[in-house]
Each structure stands twice: as structure tokens, then as C-alpha cells.
Amino acid sequence: MIKLRLKRFGKKREASFRLVACNSTSRRDGRPLQELGFYNPRTKETRLDTEALRLRLSQGAQPTDAVRSLLEKGGLIEKTVRPAEVVGKAKQAEARKAAAKNVAKQAAEAKAEETPADNTEA
């Protein structure tokens, strides 16, 4: 599978990245199939080869999260709606218990409203 990913280059603590198409099993800084752009996070400079990127995307290349973000900002792909964060099992159990208590409380209040108290004094 072809991946669109960032290839790091530059000096220590002054990294820049090339946007490349490469095989998903190759190393991050290995030899790419094609260079498709450039990104400098310090200056926010971005250069994209839009024709080549559209071609690779149409062929089924999968962008990484960082590349997807750059492509969304560049207008090459639509923004994706990311799923909500996965909550741990303990928090899910607590949420279920709290919801069950709320339902029971509401049911008890509804039952109390239905049965009026007998205040018939003669």
C-alpha cells in the first residue's frame, strides 16, 4: 500500500519535512517513490504539488494524520470528522450507573406525581 507521509530532514532542532509517497513498509526516511511537497513547521511554509497529489490520492494512496491535516488546509481533500475519543471501561461503567440512577430517580418522581396524597378530612 502506498502511504503519503512526512520525511524529516534538516539540522537538529530545525526540522523541515518533505511530503513523499512511499511504500507503507519502508522506513520513514527511506527512499520515496515520489516527492510531492514541502513543509516547514517553524515558518508554516507549505508547498504542495497538487496535480501529483491528486493523482496519488486517486490511485488509493493513504495519507497519515499529519499529511491529512496539511491536505485539508491546502484544500485538496475535505475535512474529515474524527470520532470522539474512546473512553476507558471504568469511565463507561460509571456513566452507565449514573444514567441508571437518573432514570430511576425520574421514574420515582413521575410515580409520586401520579398518585396524589389522600387529604380528605371530614
From Swiss-Prot:
- Record's keyword annotation contains NADP: no
Q: Mention one GO molecular function.
A: structural constituent of ribosome
Which Pfam families does the annotation name?
Ribosomal_S16
What keywords does the record list, in alphabetical order?
A: Ribonucleoprotein, Ribosomal protein
- GO CC entries: cytoplasm; small ribosomal subunit
Keyword Ubl conjugation assigned to the entry: answer is no
PROSITE patterns documented for this protein: RIBOSOMAL_S16
- Return the InterPro entries for the record: Ribosomal_bS16, Ribosomal_bS16_CS, Ribosomal_bS16_dom_sf
Q: What biological-process GO terms show up in the record?
A: translation
Q: Which family does it belong to?
A: Belongs to the bacterial ribosomal protein bS16 family.
Q: Which protein is depicted?
A: Small ribosomal subunit protein bS16
Gene for this chain: rpsP
